[in-house]
Amino acid sequence: MPSFDIVSEVDKQEIRNAVDQLNKEVSTRFDFKGSDARAEQTDYELYLYADDEFKLGQVMDILMTKFTKREIDVRCLEKGQTEKISGNKVKQKVTVKTGVESDLAKKIIKLVKDSKLKVQASIQGEVVRVTGAKRDILQEAIQLVKGSITELPLQFRNFRD
């Protein structure tokens, strides 16, 4: 039976490249001269540091620009609370969401079942597997999910006949 997987993945190396480009741009920009603005990465978590809220907003804008240039969808970014650290300096945690969370997976399964397409969808960890009798029906399911789910960038992988 033909099947495919619905996943949400972000390449860790592309994140690293975007963060490196951000740090390089911040170090050379005139409006950040003498500033301690920077970004650090640990796996899928980013920490943005700046001297004040305004500069933190600018660092976030630069981050989104760099992600877009590296073809990373910015919908996968989840901003955390802004924290004050020593003096006037501020820090913000930004999480890169990967994997299809259970709430979104249930929403996808409900969407597919309510569409009356002859396919079955099941949750397998952070992946939603969709199986059907014909390839054409699976392609209709892909179009349905692409058109309806917009809160997280989804990829359709492992298409098998």
Curated annotation (Swiss-Prot):
GO molecular function, one term: nucleotide binding
Gene Ontology CC annotations of this record: cytosol
InterPro entries the record matches: DUF520, UPF0234-like_C, UPF0234_N, YajQ-like_sf
UniProt keyword list: Nucleotide-binding
Protein origin, superkingdom: Bacteria
Known role: Nucleotide-binding protein.
HAMAP family: YajQ (MF_00632)
Record-linked NCBIfam families: PRK05412.1 (NF003819)
Family from the record: Belongs to the YajQ family.
Name of the featured protein: Nucleotide-binding protein NE2248
Taxonomy of the source species: Bacteria, Pseudomonadati, Pseudomonadota, Betaproteobacteria, Nitrosomonadales
